[in-house]
Swiss-Prot record:
Species, as recorded: Bothrops neuwiedi
Name this protein carries in UniProt: Bradykinin-potentiating peptide 11
Keywords: Hypotensive agent, Metalloenzyme inhibitor, Metalloprotease inhibitor, Protease inhibitor, Pyrrolidone carboxylic acid, Secreted, Toxin
Purpose: This peptide both inhibits the activity of the angiotensin-converting enzyme (ACE) and enhances the action of bradykinin by inhibiting the peptidases that inactivate it. It acts as an indirect hypotensive agent.
GO biological process, one term: regulation of blood pressure
Gene Ontology MF annotations: peptidase inhibitor activity; toxin activity
Subcellular location: Secreted
Length: 11
């Protein structure tokens, strides 16, 4: 399984 990208939380 490919590592899932970390969701970027807007500031």
């Amino acid at each position: 399984q490919w590592p899932r990208p970390t969701p970027q939380i807007p500031p």
